[in-house]
Amino acid sequence: MKFMSATAVFAAALSSVTEASSIQDQIKNTDCNVSKLGYSTSQAFTDMMLADNTEYRAADSVSFYDFSTSSRLPRKHLSSSSEASPTTEGVSSSSSGETDEKTEEELDNGGIIYAREKLTISESQDSLSNQSIELHDNSIFFGEGEVIFDHRVALKNGGAIYGEKEVVFENIKSLLVEVNIAVEKGGSVYAKERVSLENVTEATFSSNGGEQGGGGIYSEQDMLISDCNNVHFQGNAAGATAVKQCLDEEMIVLLAECVDSLSEDTLDSTPETEQTESNGNQDGSSETEDTQVSESPESTPSPDDVLGKGGGIYTEKSLTITGITGTIDFVSNIATDSGAGVFTKENLSCTNTNSLQFLKNSAGQHGGGAYVTQTMSVTNTTSESITTPPLIGEVIFSENTAKGHGGGICTNKLSLSNLKTVTLTKNSAKESGGAIFTDLASIPITDTPESSTPSSSSPASTPEVVASAKINRFFASTAKPAAPSLTEAESDQTDQTETSDTNSDIDVSIENILNVAINQNTSAKKGGAIYGKKAKLSRINNLELSGNSSQDVGGGLCLTESVEFDAIGSLLSHYNSAAKEGGAIHSKTVTLSNLKSTFTFADNTVKAIVESTPEAPEEIPPVEGEESTATEDPNSNTEGSSANTNLEGSQGDTADTGTGDVNNESQDTSDTGNAESEEQLQDSTQSNEENTLPNSNIDQSNENTDESSDSHTEEITDESVSSSSESGSSTPQDGGAASSGAPSGDQSISANACLAKSYAASTDSSPVSNSSGSEEPVTSSSDSDVTASSDNPDSSSSGDSAGDSEEPTEPEAGSTTETLTLIGGGAIYGETVKIENFSGQGIFSGNKAIDNTTEGSSSKSDVLGGAVYAKTLFNLDSGSSRRTVTFSGNTVSSQSTTGQVAGGAIYSPTVTIATPVVFSKNSATNNANNTTDTQRKDTFGGAIGATSAVSLSGGAHFLENVADLGSAIGLVPGTQNTETVKLESGSYYFEKNKALKRATIYAPVVSIKAYTATFNQNRSLEEGSAIYFTKEASIESLGSVLFTGNLVTLTLSTTTEGTPATTSGDVTKYGAAIFGQIASSNGSQTDNLPLKLIASGGNICFRNNEYRPTSSDTGTSTFCSIAGDVKLTMQAAKGKTISFFDAIRTSTKKTGTQATAYDTLDINKSEDSETVNSAFTGTILFSSELHENKSYIPQNVVLHSGSLVLKPNTELHVISFEQKEGSSLVMTPGSVLSNQTVADGALVINNMTIDLSSVEKNGIAEGNIFTPPELRIIDTTTGGSGGTPSTDSESNQNSDDTEEQNNNDASNQGESANGSSSPAVAAAHTSRTRNFAAAATATPTTTPTATTTTSNQVILGGEIKLIDPNGTFFQNPALRSDQQISLLVLPTDSSKMQAQKIVLTGDIAPQKGYTGTLTLDPDQLQNGTISVLWKFDSYRQWAYVPRDNHFYANSILGSQMLMVTVKQGLLNDKMNLARFEEVSYNNLWISGLGTMLSQVGTPTSEEFTYYSRGASVALDAKPAHDVIVGAAFSKMIGKTKSLKRENNYTHKGSEYSYQASVYGGKPFHFVINKKTEKSLPLLLQGVISYGYIKHDTVTHYPTIRERNKGEWEDLGWLTALRVSSVLRTPAQGDTKRITVYGELEYSSIRQKQFTETEYDPRYFDNCTYRNLAIPMGLAFEGELSGNDILMYNRFSVAYMLSIYRNSPTCKYQVLSSGEGGEIICGVPTRNSARGEYSTQLYLGPLWTLYGSYTIEADAHTLAHMMNCGARMTF
């Protein structure tokens, strides 16, 4: 850099100087020839000479030669243009006389201060006293706590300050360091040791620049910023071209004055001498300098010459920030290389800082905000968790840009923790990691030789001829290497990082933060926001990932190994996008765990587009006047603030020129043009900054309309610069010198063109491989890879420079040159995706994976996983059944792909979900219209797509999902094996899903074992709208399984998602619910597919499943639930039913005329073959209740246990039928059980049941009272065609064998149920280039279990049981006369009928209705029927059951017990606690009551039990000193139960009662002897109660399936009067007391009249029970005390004599017959005993707890009464 052409440097720099109006008038213009060192092309330019303020202007073409340079540019006080601050007066500095003795190091470093020792600057001017410094300028401003360093230039390092030791700023209120420039490093401050800012209130480093690095501050050690309020780094720049933008008008004037101040005595060497010295250096005479002297402007300098790193701060070690109470920000800093805000060779640590901000910084390479070679960490230690306040601190990275990786941060490891807010927004990168990049090891290391950094303090390293080059610092730059270059230290660090990363932990850690927002970041390759290896985001209260985008994979996050979200409060990820995979998240392993609240992934998109005419995105319109290109290189300039339009245009022109005549190019530019270009630059800079969008991935083009597109894509290298700029001249090799002297016109190059190449080399330094790929990640329309020539039509204009660049052996990560084969994971992409142990709800909504290849193009991409794509495993488990995850509106779609489209919401080979989920309106569609049917693959898995296994165990709801195959769940493997869809536990609902071909669930194996499974109103174009399986299926109901309303129709009128494929032929589509078809295209497999139906814990029902030729043609509907090559097995537990309201129309692969050749259908077969009585004893039911049901099952049916029920007019056609012992075949009127014509099969019936209840009243068919069921035999006529279902019903077998055969020949067998021409679907995941085709998986043929039947015969034996459970048959008036009734139709051919020991049982003698008897008519057995003879007796409305009528009367005893229980509580508790000797008081009582009464059966009464419970509230007071009066209200609820075992009926009643009571007490003395005044103390207590009791009773009669209801009321009175006397009074210190008492108790209960309802009702009259008893007893009282607690206890026993009672008598009458009588209630005996115990616990003067228990017993009755509660005294 030191020995570049002075002319080339000055030509561009000082053109700006002449634009300054402040000096223009002072300068006179003179045209002349000027001689300076170096060479250049001739061009109109303006240069400043060093004498008499004369401006010399050269016009037209001038050859420059014999240049001279000064040995040194002496410093001038640049403050001469403005007055120095008076506050600097007195500060010591070197005298002017000592200037010549200063070293060049001191003169060239430190624009204001050169410090030899530690430099400390505070707010006082005295801070500079007594410090070993060289003060070059007295212009430092000190005043009122303010310190200013501004507008200074250093020819080497430290534009304002240079320190050989530590530099410290401390205790300053306001520090302003602005517009200082260093030609090398440290625009404002350069220090060889630490730089510190401590205790500074306000610090600003603004618009400083360092050409090589450290635009603001450069430290060779570390840097510390601590205990400050606000620190600002704004508009600083690193790198030659970047520094140019720091110039302002004042700085230009100062530079002009500096140039003008060169004194003639410093020019002590002649031009000839200088030229000779220069030539000598170029010839290699100097070891230190000649290499650099010999370099032409196109040669490669050492990396440090073009460092361009650290626009704000550069440190060779670490940067530490701590204790910032306000804000530390890095705003609008620029670096032509890396780290526009901060560049540090080691770590960046920020602790206890209120706000750290990186805003609008721009880097030409990596780390637009910060580049940290090792670890960047930001944390606060004020709080340990987000729930422990205060949590302070914010980190903001916003609108930072990088042309390489990491628009915001580029580091090896990042840690953000214990913060209030983290915001990453609108950052962008031309490579990967729009906001954060942490994979430094993946950045290629250039092979460009490195040179050691020249020491700025060494005189030997300073050339003698440098002044001219140093002044023009802004433009002295050279070409950058081909790939991002790293210094040797960085290279070593990268190697160490790469080695240790294998075992490293997390490189992106964001934890314990209140709010994290990652929004609107973009990258041209991977990771729109974050790119790294491992990331963990944990303990975050709110996390938002929104609006990020990438042009490759991972629109939001891209991690090469793993990403983990742990303990997130609220997670929102929406509107992220990527071009290939992972719209929001892309990683090898994705884990979401312990999420505390709702997590949402919404409207994320993966979208790839191939267009016939590429267009720029609408959201980024081209800048006015720029040339639109088809594709733009990701590495082209996006930084409007650093883009010189004219310079970039020159670069493009030079590249296009190649080896042509550059003089023609030179003539295109003028002085005016240069000035206009500078103005355009400023306008373009502002425009680009304002118009740049956060989601933009397209570069802003240059305004020069003549530039070629390869200016964006060409990679500038050392060799390319030389070859393109020198025509025919040799490039210096191995330090060889270029030809000196005056070059020819052909060999010369314009200054601006040279500078343009230098600028391009310093900014456009991405790898060559990037230039060959299109920016847009598109899928190729052919099998060949996308190349640069195909994507960029102008790439050929790059000449040999691009062609000579070495291509890397591997494409860099994110390259889109390969053919795109997968588009997937609209929200999440990973090899393994796990979402576990979350506490809130989950939402995946509106995510999309789209192949938008336009029509006319062809795509082979697979489009998989609209919301989630997992390459190996997807696992969803909340750990709780109360958490739900919803997948709604997710989509995979394609316009033209011949690849696979699958998994509208989720795609993974293995899917495991163990939490409740909802899948709604997800879809997988392929709308390709430019492919043939053989090219287009069927989509599968509208909600879930898989190839290995799907397991759901927490319940799910699938609603309105769409796909070709498996509209809800599609499992399509490459090779048909045992891949299973398994639904376990929970409840599952499949509703209104639409299959454009087949099935809601499509899989080889389907296993359902659920509490609830409902398939409702699902639709398909072909068979099996609910389930389609190709290997095996098992459905087990633990609660309820229902298939209803499923529809197969050729027209899906409501479907708008794509055009369904048409079917060939008019084929009947049986199997509207379930269809099984062998996965074999040639049909060679001979085994049928097992389908097992198990009703173990609930019912299974098929109803209204329909095939409809057109959606509106309901008149030709066929209702069929199951079809296909299916081998059925059915099991139903006791009390459970498998119901078929639709027909079964299965087919078979078996052939032959013998029944043994066909499969066996086992009904209720025990799992243990040795067990005779199976655990499955439930019912299998076929019904025509809803519509015709003619079922055809080509199997040998064996009924092992339970019941097979054929409802009226239902037909079941099987190969053969065998009924095992203990089972039941139930047939109803009009039902048919038949064999089929395909084989010789027999019907073996043992113990048949005929249900008569479905016969309508007055129903007589052809002289018979009902249409009898039929056992039908059909001769074998087809030669064993496979048992396909018949479309027409066979005729009744009332004709001979010939007619029977004619009516049931092969023509009646109809079409095959599996006659559809569409092929079975095979795999797509493992073989994506093939269409779905059934895989030929041959399995060994198994021999069906042989049945022990005789061919084509009905063998009937055992009982024929008649049942009429509802009693409807015998209510038919047709039975009022004797007659013969046909019960069963049999074959008329006696050879086809065997009857053995038939017995008629069941309802043959009805108890109500038309009563009579039925007997078997043996004469009709040979006539093809079984008939009975009916003998009419009489008509009876009700069946007679002898009833005991005592129950209603006995309930009076329960009512009396309610009254007594309340009385006992009032006397034993409330009155016994009364203390009449105390002062007046009031009591509030709250009590709980309970009673239980049991009575054993007696000759006059039934056994019954009664119990009740209730509550009571009482209030009493002392109106007088010795009188207590109170009132109480009680409510009781009771139940009565009576079981009459011998007559098999039960009474169950319930009662509730209300009682009101008053009570009182008074002590008095009974005078025994008036003379002696001897008296007996007595206590009188009394209670009066009134009660209302309501009864409600139901009586069940199981034998006749009837019941009675009775409701009545009781009214009750109870009066009790007790007198007691103390026999023993307590002595001193003794509390024992003995009392004797007597009581008079009277009760009266009156039962009101009532009438029963329902069965044979009775009327009951009033009855009353009265009882007068005299209890007499002895009571013992005493107290226990301790720990200030007093417990008083009382125990008494009494004998109770009933002196009067009546036996209640109730009259009744049976309304139907008029019969009547009297009921005498069984009352207790007259003598009984009663025991009482009560206790009181005194808790103080106001509160008392109490309780009492009473037991009463006699010979037949036992009663328990309890009362407990609390008393409050007030």
Curated annotation (Swiss-Prot):
Residues 1477-1770 form the Autotransporter domain. Residues 268-285, 631-675, 682-703, 1303-1319 have a biased composition (Polar residues). Belongs to the PMP outer membrane protein family. SUPFAM superfamilies: Autotransporter (SSF103515), Pectin lyase-like (SSF51126). It is a peripheral membrane protein. Residues 85-97, 294-303, 496-505, 719-748, 762-802 have a biased composition (Low complexity). It comes from Chlamydia trachomatis serovar D (strain ATCC VR-885 / DSM 19411 / UW-3/Cx). GO terms for cellular component: cell outer membrane; extracellular region. Residues 73-109, 264-311, 481-505, 611-818, 1271-1329 are annotated as: Disordered. It is found in: Secreted, Cell wall; Cell outer membrane. InterPro entries: Autotransporte_beta (IPR005546), Autotransporte_beta_dom_sf (IPR036709), Pectin_lyase_fold/virulence (IPR011050), Polymorphic_membr_middle (IPR011427), POMP_repeat (IPR003368). Pfam families: Autotransporter, Chlam_PMP, ChlamPMP_M. Keywords: Cell outer membrane, Cell wall, Membrane, Secreted, Signal, Transmembrane, Transmembrane beta strand. It comes from the Bacteria. Residues 1-20 form the signal peptide. This is Probable outer membrane protein PmpC.
